[in-house]
Amino acid sequence: MALDSESSASNRQGSRNEQDTNPRLTAALCLTALGVVYGDIATSPLYAFREALHNIAPDSRTPESILGILSLIFWALIILVSIKYLLIIMRADNHGEGGILALLALLRPWRGSPQHQRNVLIVLGLFGAALLYGDGMITPAISVLSAMEGLEVAAPQLTSYIIPATTVILVLLFMVQKRGTARIGRVFGPIMLVWFVVIALLGLNGIIHHPQVLVAVNPYYGINFFTDNGWSAFRVLGGVFLALTGAEALYADMGHVGRAPIRLMWFALVLPALLLNYFGQGALLLLDPHEAQPFFHLAPPSFLYSLVGLATLATIIASQAIISGVFSLTRQAIQLGQSPRLTLVQTSSEEIGQVYVPAANWFMMIAAVWLVLHFRSSDNLAGAFGIAVSGTMVITTILAFFVMRERWHWNILTAVAVTVGFLIIDLAFFSSNLLKITDGGWFPLAIAVFIFTLMITWQQGRQLLIQRIHKETESFQDFLQRIVTDPPVRVSGTAVFLTIHQHDTPPALLYQLIHNKALHEQVVLVTVITEEVPRVPAAERLEVMELSSGFHRIIVHYGFMQSPNVPVALRACETLGLKIDLDTTTYYLSRASLIPTDERPGMALWRDRLFAFMSRNSAWPTAFYHLPPEHVIELGIQVEL
């Protein structure tokens, strides 16, 4: 049955790819794009313009400076989101999937690249992924908090309840993650459709009262803003960037709905609605440059309570999108061998992409609640926002250069010109955000360094462990020859041994033979390989090889968006001529006990200890490979690092 569901998942992916090139996209798919993809960037009007203006002294908030900031927001949305992400970066899909790890896998730096290039790509990709974890903690905090701050305008007497209410909403949001979003996700799209229509109408109303604001589409005002304000204009870029914080999510979430629906909804609805609202806020600020909450003051007083409620729903949806994105990113990292095995819970029997990661969920919840309690306002929290996403954008641009050259075969001049053009803008935003380090920007950087250290240590430690075991293990060819020469006693049943190296004898097999002096009649060696593609169709999943003396080798292929299920794979082997009775099958696993030491070459001792700690606390292979616990025997081995 699980195999059938994977087949149907592959079929859904195939039909989605067909829709991706079909101009007659369904309304349902476009609504899904609104709910899944656009939540983050949709809620930026709550705080982006306000925070950009806060970097200007009150006596310098002239009409020219307001128009200058508005012009910067306009052209940033056009150049970075519309052109860079929607038209260029989203072409770099890995069999329909996007995101920085999918982009890294697309480049396949593990195979054939020069050593220095391989190291640079892996470090960039892993650090970019690590930065997104910081974004996953800050986005829920600042989004929900900024929505609740609408109470300051609607009901000033309720201001003292903003922090407690935000905390309660965040805790509830993270607590319901284990139930999945399959049901409530269906209403996300319609809610976001209402949100975009409302913010567009609010902005249009502001523009009608002050249509002169439309001159800000002229880039002259943005350029003039820099020439007139100098250093303070550079600081403003950190606030302007908040209008772009959901751009990376457009690429990361591409696998959910496909490229075409995302592009269609951006140009048909999302971009016009955002621009109307930003220009409406600009019109309001031209009339009152000292307005503290320009977004909420666009609404008539009678609509404020409804707007606060709608904004809260929109920010919850935005938070849900980034939380789900972190879960998906974590699964990719685990399957690609860049993270320890963590418990993964499939929350939908229909959508293979919906997964819940308890460890990541509680870590993000604690961090988000701490951020709210520590910073206490979205103004203060804005200092911590932006660094993670702007850093990821820089890394995405660099990785995209290699895609242009190696995958799209662009000539060097075109690739360099496009990359340098985007990098100049990306680095300007990133540098401006670095000025926020003392105001809270240290938090996402600290989280990124912490996560990156874990990921790079796990990856290198795993490689060292595999090398050490390989050196100390008998080749399977020699082992098989020994079995033929001196046959052991055979007992009924099937023994399954999981092995990483196809040409090595699994340590558990050696120890089982030494201690029991016998082998099962049927011995199956299983190697699970995670390919650098999101999904491997069920028809291409298995390779079955008959060896000799009752031995078979099975190679099982999965994509990095799939969860391995060894019993299901073994059951499917019957279609390839190998029948395995799962009721009489015993699974033998090797459990390595790691001994950190500084006597061997490799990592520093503290990293050896960190790797050993992660290995001890990673999810058991029994659960990870969906093995029945009552049929599993683990044999321990000691390995010096």
Curated annotation (Swiss-Prot):
TM helices/strands, residue ranges: 29-49, 69-89, 120-140, 156-176, 188-208, 236-256, 267-287, 307-327, 355-375, 384-404, 410-430, 437-457
Enzymatic reactions: K(+)(in) + H(+)(in) = K(+)(out) + H(+)(out)
Pfam families membership: K_trans, K_trans_C
Polar residues bias (residue ranges): 1-14
Cell inner membrane listed as a keyword: yes
Main location: membrane
The keyword Cell cycle appears for this protein: no
GO molecular function: potassium ion transmembrane transporter activity; symporter activity
Spans annotated as Disordered: 1-20
Membrane topology: Multi-pass membrane protein
Residues spanning the signal sequence: none
GO CC terms in record: plasma membrane
Keywords: Cell inner membrane, Cell membrane, Ion transport, Membrane, Potassium, Potassium transport, Symport, Transmembrane, Transmembrane helix, Transport
Entry's localization field: Cell inner membrane
HAMAP family membership: Kup (MF_01522)
Biological role stated in the UniProt entry: Transport of potassium into the cell. Likely operates as a K(+):H(+) symporter.
Family in the record: Belongs to the HAK/KUP transporter (TC 2.A.72) family.
Protein name: Probable potassium transport system protein Kup
Organism the protein comes from: Nitrosomonas eutropha (strain DSM 101675 / C91 / Nm57)
